[in-house]
């Protein structure tokens, strides 16, 4: 129902406003941990779109390759790839605290396994009661984190020369 969704969005907005200072503080803590890392963003399947959005923010704002995956799907092949993982990678799990018990255990085992390969594993807990509130909260934290990382790395988050090059090249076809 649209009215219910609007009410949830309003609650999400109110949460972000109320938590603004905490969001920025948490974002800076995340940024400091990921500053020199390749960000890897994981979420439960129902929050995969958020993980992708966060990956894109790291791509665009810090001009940094990143990737995103979702539990339990990443446990099929990607977890094997962590056999070659190392400290170049920094993992952020978007923890919405609403996993079923089996998937919560899966998360703990997965993060422990990945933690054997990299020293940076961040279990970022959402605030909020609804999926919309949790999504808006985590999105805000990590949007700020991507901007803070760009600043820490002296990267111009506005610059998009490679996109301009692509557009100019395509215009000549």
Over which residues does each language-model region extend?
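A SIS-like phosphosugar-recognition module
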Residues: 1-173
């Amino acid at each position: 129902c649209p009215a219910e969704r609007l009410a949830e969005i309003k609650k999400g907005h109110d949460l972000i406003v109320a938590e603004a200072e905490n969001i920025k503080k948490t974002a800076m803590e995340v940024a400091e941990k990921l500053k020199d890392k390749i960000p890897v963003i994981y979420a439960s399947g129902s929050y995969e779109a958020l993980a992708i959005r966060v990956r894109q923010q790291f791509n665009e704002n810090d001009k940094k390759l990143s990737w995103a995956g979702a539990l339990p799907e990443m446990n099929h092949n990607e977890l094997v790839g962590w056999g070659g993982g190392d400290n170049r990678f920094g993992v952020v799990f978007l923890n919405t605290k609403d996993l079923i018990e089996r998937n919560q255990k899966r998360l703990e085992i997965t993060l422990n396994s990945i933690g054997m390969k990299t020293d940076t594993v961040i279990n970022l807990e959402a605030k909020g009661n609804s999926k919309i509130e949790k999504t808006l909260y985590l999105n805000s934290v990590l949007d700020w984190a991507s901007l803070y990382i760009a600043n820490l790395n002296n990267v111009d988050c506005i610059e998009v020369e490679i996109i301009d090059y692509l557009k100019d090249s395509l215009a000549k076809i």
